[in-house]
Amino acid sequence: MATNDKTMFFDFGQERQEDIKQTLKTVYESLEEKGYNPINQIVGYLLSGDPAYIPRLNDARNLIRQHERDEIIEELVRSYLKNNGETK
C-alpha cells in the first residue's frame, strides 16, 4: 500500500465564506429568539450533525444544512484567528 506524504490543499471561495457568515448570523439570531444558548446549540450541531439543535424559525435549519460542517468550522477558525491577530 502506497502512502501519500503530500499535504492536501482545501479552499473555498470568498462568496461561500460570506454566505456561511450570513447563515451563522441568521442561525444565531433564531436561537436567541427561541430562548436557547446559541453557542451551545451551534456547537452541538457541529459536533453531532443533528439538525435538531437548530430551530426551523427563519428557515435557520435549512440554511445551515446547505453548508458542510467542515466548511462552517473552517470559517469559524478563520474568523477567530483573524480577529485575534493571528492571520490575515
From Swiss-Prot:
Disulfide bonds: none annotated. InterPro entries: IreB (IPR009309). NCBIfam families: PRK05473.1. Belongs to the UPF0297 family. This is UPF0297 protein Lreu_0534.
